[in-house]
From Swiss-Prot:
Gene coding for it: erb1
Superkingdom classification of source: Eukaryota
Name under which the protein is recorded: Ribosome biogenesis protein erb1
Composition bias type Pro residues, residue spans: 318-335
Disordered: annotated segments: 1-125, 308-354
InterPro entries: BOP1/Erb1, BOP1_N_dom, WD40/YVTN_repeat-like_dom_sf, WD40_repeat_CS, WD40_repeat_dom_sf, WD40_rpt
Amino acid sequence: MSAAKVSKKRKAVTKDVEEEAGVFSGDELNVGDIDGALSDDANDLSSDEEDSEVELVDDFSSDEDEDEEEELDSDEIPSDGEAPLKKKSGTSAADLEVPTNDDESSSEEEQPNFRIEKDANGNDRYIYDEINPDDNSDYSDVEENANTIGNIPLSFYDQYPHIGYDINGKKIMRPATGEALDALLDSIEIPKGFTGLTDPSTGKPLELSQDELELLRKVQMNEIPEEGYNPYEPLMEWFSNKQEIMPLSAAPEPKRRFVPSKHEAKRVMKIVKAIREGRILPYKPPSEEKEEDLELINYDLWADEAERPDHPMHVPAPKLPPPGYEESYHPPPEYLPDNKERKAWQEADPEDREREYLPTDFGSLRKVPGYGEFVKEKFERCLDLYLAPRVRRSKLNIDPESLLPKLPSPEELKPFPSVCATVFRGHKGRVRSLAVDPTGVWLATGGDDGTVRVWELLTGRQLYSVKVGEEDPVNVVRWRPSKDAVVLAAAAGDDIYLIVPPILDPELEQASLDLLDAGWGYAASKPAPKASEEGKKTTPPQWVRPSAALADNGVCAVIPLRYVAKSISWHRRGDYFVTVCPGSSTPASMAIAIHTLSKHLTQYPFSRRIKGGGPPQTAHFHPSKPILFVANQRTVRAYDLSRQLLVKIIQPGARWISSFDIHPTSSTASGGDNLIVGSYDRRLLWHDLELSQRPYKTLRYHRKAIRAVKFHPSGRYPLFADASDDGSLQIFHGSVTGDMLSNASIVPLKVLKGHKITGELGVMDLDWHPREAWCVSAGADGTCRLWM
């Protein structure tokens, strides 16, 4: 039992009872009984043992003991940790001896924390040791010179030399105040924990301890002040971590939950009976009062509010223009002025400046200062709003789609080529040129391997092949447009080869050979050139017969041009064809040559270089007029051969023209006055010569250079196409009418992709079937493709 309980038991008033023989008197008190009554082990006893112990203590107490205990103070009673006192019979309280424990294993907590002294009256006085608080104690150490005046302002002690009292009642003298020099030194050499405040209880400078500084640092850094506290301890689910199966939570379902309730059935039957009798109505119409209440609740304050119309003379204020790149705090470098521009802006008058500020690069937004002209700009804005007159401009509400031309659907414009039907393989290297014969049966190709090959168009079977260039590629091949004789012209190196393939029927082959042989007689009757003219470079070349090997393979004539020809174009009658040598080393007078098949004659129509636009690139005859179109790098010129005059100069605006073609229909239907131009700068241009010298339409659908453009040769299908280095062909619908009030209609139809890009080159050339809506393309991948 605790000491407090012992004291209560000793001071309790007990009734006098007679001593029995088995009860000990107070003088015969045993030490073991007292030890059991005062030690802490009594807490482990049961309630029955405590009751018996109280009875023993009451029996052991005597009248003399009660008187002595009444004289004891509460602070003289031993604490729970004190050892029991031994009392002998006939001894007083002064004779009590403090028992000592000789056992070395006893701890310091079991030693008594008091000593017994005599007071002034001679009574025993218990003097306790000072409490040494630990970390778990509510007590704290008191400083020796701590001021104990409490919550009293120090101004009460202004007239006294002291400022309070310590715990022993001694005066605490006022601390000495430093002079100005000391204050200056203190401000320079700031000690650790310095706050600049004065402690109201001591009058000394208030300094914080290391623990207080650490606490302030943690609070400032938003850290947890308490040491060792972990805010992210693992969650301990006290109520759900262990599933306890017991009748409270996992009891079996009662039977009443599966059996219909009889009481509910009775109540439902009462309601059904009342509904049948009419005492309960399933739907009760709301009363008028409730409807009025609902109307009042749902009243809309602005239900009848009408929008206030603007004044007839009201004109809204114009909005400020949105800021541009030059107003950014980190503008692009091209918007930043250099030193010259900055100096010119600073020297100019404010009225003459283009803008009120100079673009400045601050690097980051936090470095941007305040705008100095902010107030001035707002003031001028206010002046403009109420002083400047306003003008209302009517805005036209135009549908953007109405501005676009209404193009028909591609499905309505069929037929046009859309799929690859045949692939022609056999050339080694790039296929530079191809051509479909006027009958539409054969396809002629020429490539880097120096061979000219003739294929069957529908099947892709090779029928004829001849090698005309040992090291030079075949740059261009073209069929004679007439059907009475079949002649194939091929340019390889510096020569032009006229070939009659041995794949024709005998009659057609003989007619073709007779056409070429007729020219030999005219050339023989022509006077021979003089010796002085033979050395000139401008002397037209003489047609020669081929070698025996070439003659056996169908080559009938050779024209030595002395320069590489890149373009061949036949006249519609089949008796003339023009060649162009665009090389930079070619003389201007020999770049363009016109050849007569029936006379074996070559002429140079231009004695001087064409002005402007660079060397010539390609040339074509007009389909119905005696006009020759010659294209150089930048312009297309039309020459009247009968009058020998320059008719027109067409300016496509391209950097480098690669090819062009003339509309095949007659001039009476305005077809011959339209042409298309392809350029190496990825543009396809449509020209209406009656409209302007400039392009009517510019189409930019390719990512790389355009190599060839071509109209469909018959007027039956209004189709044209272009071939590009991006490996694709673009098919267009271009209808031309004779109405002078209507323009040409151009509709993109299909993008054909199949050739592989080899060496940055894609599709090199293309041609149309003379009767069908088919086209054939030659690629740098060594193949040709028929598109249907």
